[in-house]
From Swiss-Prot:
Pfam families: PSI_8. The keyword Disulfide bond does not apply. It comes from Chara vulgaris. GO terms for biological process: photosynthesis. It is found in: Plastid, Chloroplast thylakoid membrane. May help in the organization of the PsaL subunit. It is a single-pass membrane protein. InterPro entries: PSI_PsaI, PSI_PsaI_sf. Belongs to the PsaI family. This is Photosystem I reaction center subunit VIII. The gene is psaI.
Amino acid sequence: MISAYLPSFFVPLVCLVFPAIAMAFLFVQIEKEEIV
């Protein structure tokens, strides 16, 4: 029965946390490169 609740836990995790980490990583890379 626990597996029935996993999607409702992973969907916000993937849709909110992963993009936040990706944007933070890209921001650090851009700041490190100093292209702007």
